[in-house]
């Protein structure tokens, strides 16, 4: 057996505590699978007096980040403090000191992946990040290794457990958005400020990472078209169910090379190429109406799932807990085992992530992405309103697939919900139509719309 692999853990909160526990409680198993001992040498924390797992020897705990990074007995630095400021400095300093890095920091990779990976290549060291996307679901390894013979043509994923918990509660228990969010916060699925979860930002960070691995595309999270779940009303849940659909917050990537059938026609949601002939990939995070029979429609609660389409293998699904102490720790320790075996070093060198050697894809402009749309309007109940709306849609070459309008109350006078499902249309044209509809003066509230997943 070769020398011990020394580990410094920077951050020992929920996930860091889980990593320390797994390394110490299952040391024999991990040694067997890594082919060498994985020894926890340092644990860096903000508050050394905070109670910790009794398996962590007190002498390992300190507040000295630099001491941990430059300790000659440390070969790997595990960054689990999150965010961009201190975490980025820790990662770059560790690489400069000749240490491998394991991180679960999606924001760091999505925003500064190019800088981090260039530093790793200069230092001839490895960055592992399985836990940065979908927690305990091994989708990074699947894309980088198991599907290496494929060109991924599309990804559809539920990457935020908080949003999926809220939508599940609304669909299955008839809860309002506000009530479902409050329950998610009470159970610890949502933060006191849930903005990053419910507005799609968290999922956009993760999609940016998946897009880099799958297509070689470097897309900043703010460059990804994004729509959150906070505009979804109980009315939308009911109408979707009536139409045979469930609403899910999806992170999606579509290439022009991916098509699917609907009503016997082959359709592509992403453009084939840009003006220079370079193939494009459409990236967006938004609520999507999925048929009840779709695989992702059946993912419940706080679980994550990633559906990957490869040009050789076809459709593969990866599902499991997307967050939490032990699921995330499982992925972090798996990266450490890969480093111990030497597998991670070989795959890192071959992958060339966040480098100039991309795979020839560019990001599709959001307005060119094609979709069917669900449109809900609160309209005044008087003659001519529907005719005005359909005329505007026709002006933008948007045809109607179906329409749902329940009878108005007997007293009349108040707005009534009108739901329109369109055929495929370009997002830019659809948004122009919405702007005109909202200016008609016959709607009681701004239009609500979502993409259809078929």
Where are the regions a protein language model picked out?
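A conserved regulatory-domain signal marking ACT and ACT-like small-molecule sensing domains
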Residues: 274, 331, 336-454
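A short hydrophobic/small-residue beta-strand
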Residues: 100-102, 400
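General beta-strand structural signal in soluble alpha/beta enzymes
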Residues: 62-63, 78-79, 102-104, 127-131, ...
């Amino acid at each position: 057996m070769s020398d011990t692999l020394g580990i410094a853990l920077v951050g020992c909160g929920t996930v860091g505590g889980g990593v320390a526990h797994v390394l110490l409680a299952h040391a024999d198993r991990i040694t067997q699978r890594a082919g060498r001992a994985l020894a926890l040498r340092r644990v860096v924390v903000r508050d050394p007096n905070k109670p910790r797992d009794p398996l962590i020897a007190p002498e390992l705990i300190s507040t000295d980040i630099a001491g941990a990074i430059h300790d000659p007995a440390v070969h790997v630095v595990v960054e689990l403090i999150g965010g961009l400021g201190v975490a980025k400095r820790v990662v770059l300093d560790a690489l400069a000191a000749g240490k491998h890095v394991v991180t679960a920091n999606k924001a760091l990779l999505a925003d500064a992946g190019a800088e981090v990976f260039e530093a790793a290549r200069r230092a001839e060291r490895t960055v592992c990040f399985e836990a940065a996307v979908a927690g305990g679901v091994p989708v990074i390894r699947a894309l980088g290794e198991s599907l290496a013979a494929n060109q991924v043509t599309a990804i559809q994923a539920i990457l935020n457990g908080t949003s999926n918990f809220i939508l599940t509660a609304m669909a299955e228990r008839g809860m309002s958005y506000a009530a479902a969010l409050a329950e998610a916060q009470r159970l610890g699925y949502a933060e006191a400020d849930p903005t990053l979860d419910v507005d799609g930002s968290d999922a956009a960070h993760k999609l940016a990472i998946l897009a880099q691995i799958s297509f070689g595309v470097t897309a900043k999270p703010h460059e990804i078209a994004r729509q959150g779940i906070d505009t979804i009303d109980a009315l939308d849940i009911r109408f979707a169910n009536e139409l045979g659909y469930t609403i899910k917050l999806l992170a999606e990537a579509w290439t022009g090379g991916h098509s699917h059938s609907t009503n016997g026609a082959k359709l592509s949601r992403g453009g084939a190429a840009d003006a220079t002939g370079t193939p494009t990939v459409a990236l967006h995070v938004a609520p999507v109406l999925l048929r009840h029979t779709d695989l992702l429609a059946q993912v419940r609660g706080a679980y994550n799932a990633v559906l990957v389409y490869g040009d050789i293998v076809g459709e593969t699904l990866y599902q499991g807990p997307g967050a939490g102490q032990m699921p995330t720790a499982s992925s972090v320790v798996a990266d450490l085992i890969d480093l111990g075996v030497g597998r991670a070093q070989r795959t890192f060198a071959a992958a060339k992530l966040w480098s100039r050697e991309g795979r020839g894809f560019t990001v599709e402009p959001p307005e060119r992405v094609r979709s069917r749309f669900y449109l809900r309007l609160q309209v005044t109940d008087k003659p001519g309103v529907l005719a005005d709306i359909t005329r505007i849609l026709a002006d933008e070459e948007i045809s109607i697939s179906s329409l749902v309008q329940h009878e108005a109350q007997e007293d009349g006078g108040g707005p009534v919900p009108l739901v329109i499902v369109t055929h495929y249309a370009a997002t830019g044209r659809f948004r122009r139509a919405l702007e005109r509809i909202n200016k008609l003066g016959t709607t009681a509230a701004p239009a609500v719309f979502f993409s259809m997943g078929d």
